[in-house]
Each structure stands twice: as structure tokens, then as C-alpha cells.
């Protein structure tokens, strides 16, 4: 049986433009870009830990990362203005290259 997936809101502040581009490119392989430094990702526990490890290799001590797990009720209460609001229960899988 496949591991259960959960929605995560991931936001970051990267001080160096070169590191920012590397982190941004990595996250594009895991989820959907919502705003400048904000992604939403549907991840298994294993995917989440792998992503955190990969991000730690690209980030510096002055950079910050926030990974917010969203329960089903939280996802239902997400409201957006002039942005996509659809958070499907079973999101399309992303292929990590």
C-alpha cells in the first residue's frame, strides 16, 4: 500500500540569490509554486524528510525554512484571493528528476 500523503506549506528566506535559485529549483520538483518563496507540496513522511535533508545541503546558517503540515480540516479552510484555491484530496504526483 502506498504511503499516505499530506499537504505542506513550505516557505523560506534565502539571503543569497544563487542559493535561492537552487532551493527554488529543488522545490519545483516537489510541489507547486504559490508565491515568491512559498510552495505547497503533497508529501509522504519519507518525501518530507528527504526534502528537508536536500534543503539543508543547499541552505546556509543565515537562511530560514518553515515547513507547515496541514491537516484535512486546515486544507478545507484555506482561502485565497486572486489565487488558486483548489487543494485536491489526491493531488497529481510530481516527478523528481
From Swiss-Prot:
Residues holding Mg(2+): 13
SUPFAM superfamilies membership: TTP0101/SSO1404-like
Gene3D superfamilies: 3.30.70.240
Ranges in a coiled coil: none
Keywords, alphabetical: Antiviral defense, Endonuclease, Hydrolase, Magnesium, Metal-binding, Nuclease
EC top class, as a word: hydrolase
EC number annotated for this UniProt entry: 3.1.-.-
Induction of synthesis: Part of an operon going from at least MXAN_7266 to MXAN_7259 that includes a CRISPR operon with transcription continuing into the pre-crRNA locus.
InterPro entries reported for this sequence: CRISPR_associated_Cas2, Virulence_VapD/CRISPR_Cas2
GO terms under biological process: defense response to virus; maintenance of CRISPR repeat elements
Cofactor: Mg(2+)
GO molecular function: metal ion binding; RNA endonuclease activity
Keyword Metal-binding: yes
HAMAP family tied to this protein: Cas2
Protein role: CRISPR (clustered regularly interspaced short palindromic repeat), is an adaptive immune system that provides protection against mobile genetic elements (viruses, transposable elements and conjugative plasmids). CRISPR clusters contain sequences complementary to antecedent mobile elements and target invading nucleic acids. CRISPR clusters are transcribed and processed into CRISPR RNA (crRNA). Functions as a ssRNA-specific endoribonuclease. Involved in the integration of spacer DNA into the CRISPR cassette.
Subunit and interaction comment: Homodimer, forms a heterotetramer with a Cas1 homodimer.
Family per record: Belongs to the CRISPR-associated endoribonuclease Cas2 protein family.
Record's protein name: CRISPR-associated endoribonuclease Cas2
Source organism (scientific name): Myxococcus xanthus (strain DK1622)
Source taxonomy: Bacteria, Pseudomonadati, Myxococcota, Myxococcia, Myxococcales
Gene, per the UniProt record: cas2
Amino acid at each position: 500500500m502506498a504511503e499516505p500523503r499530506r499537504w505542506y506549506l513550505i516557505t523560506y528566506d534565502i539571503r543569497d540569490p544563487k542559493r535561492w535559485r537552487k532551493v527554488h529549483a529543488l522545490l519545483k520538483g516537489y510541489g507547486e509554486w504559490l508565491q515568491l518563496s512559498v510552495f505547497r507540496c503533497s508529501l509522504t513522511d519519507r518525501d518530507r524528510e528527504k526534502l528537508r535533508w536536500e534543503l539543508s545541503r543547499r541552505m546556509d546558517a543565515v537562511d530560514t525554512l518553515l515547513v507547515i503540515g496541514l491537516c484535512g480540516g486546515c486544507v478545507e479552510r484555506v482561502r485565497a484571493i486572486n489565487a488558486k484555491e483548489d487543494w485536491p484530496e489526491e493531488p497529481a504526483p510530481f516527478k523528481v528528476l
